[in-house]
Amino acid sequence: MEFYASLKSIAMHVPSERVKNAEFQQFLDTSDEWIEKRTGIKERRFASNEEKSSDLGVIAAKQAIERAHLTPKDIDLVVVATLSPDFLAMPSTACVLSAKLGIENKPAFDISAACTGFIYLLSVAKAYVESGMCENVLIVGAEKTSSVLDFKDRGTCILFGDGAGACVIGRTKRLKESILDVQISANGNFSNYLYTPRTLKPTPFNSKEEALEPFLCMKGNEVFKLAVKTLLKDVETILEKNALKPEDVRLFIPHQANFRIIQAVREHLDFKDEQVVLTVHKYGNTSAASIPMAMCEAYEEGRLKKGDLMLLDAFGGGLTWGSALVYFGG
């Protein structure tokens, strides 16, 4: 191989509006203590009515491109992961975001892998770069999860937040600046554990109407148990496959869904506190944006430096899951 795929830059953006747990008490049977005890979340950000996922994503994307010392014209491919796209079916949020960046005549498409979206993005970008098809790939996890939440359901609406994270994936000849390994998987037999239904209206050819509201639905207890079991196995597998141990990893950056899930994986694998990046208390579950946002915070705080090895893992609707070993090449 002449070169490897490398994570060249990272950036993030969140809306300005902070929503603290206590604000949910105004319309739900809940409390700050109840939410924080069960999730570790203290607050989250919600976008305005005018903002869409692409608006959040484009701000992060511009900064990621600048940090990679590139211009939008240098980007060969744009891929967006989101469960809250700007439009229901088309155009893709990646196409909308590309236009806002001034990128024309370059491929752009979305990935639907829910909270595992960023790991899927890494897999796609790595393949495109290492095959020689692209030199610079822009990947963006952008979420306005508040647009798909039922604010009458305290089991879901308290968990999520809005935000975006973006990375530029380029080339390197150095293994220790590369995306070392990515593994992704899915099992559609559990698709009813976490999903967003679509309302079907009657037509002249079909009188049946499904009056389901298009809000995120989740079997919380089942998802929690399966997430912990699956992530433990997945992380152990990728470490063993690459002859690595937890102490070889500079930072463990898991999907920020729930502090209890993160803690269960951390304790089982014996990661030290200083190895683990946590942002769930500040932003809640930002789905496909959570890992790049957490990565960016670590970078901006000086915890993540060039050549550092990161272990990433995520679990989401589909059900989907994945993990990655990534040397920071920025």
Curated annotation (Swiss-Prot):
The record's keywords, sorted A to Z, are:
Acyltransferase, Cytoplasm, Fatty acid biosynthesis, Fatty acid metabolism, Lipid biosynthesis, Lipid metabolism, Multifunctional enzyme, Transferase
Q: A GO biological process this protein is involved in?
A: fatty acid biosynthetic process
Q: Which GO terms describe its cellular component?
A: cytoplasm
Q: Does the keyword Cytoplasm apply?
A: yes
- Please provide, alphabetically and separated by semicolons, the GO molecular function terms listed in this UniProt record: 3-oxoacyl-[acyl-carrier-protein] synthase activity; beta-ketoacyl-acyl-carrier-protein synthase III activity
Subunit details: Homodimer.
The entry's protein name is: Beta-ketoacyl-[acyl-carrier-protein] synthase III
The organism named in the record is Helicobacter pylori (strain HPAG1)
- The gene it comes from is fabH
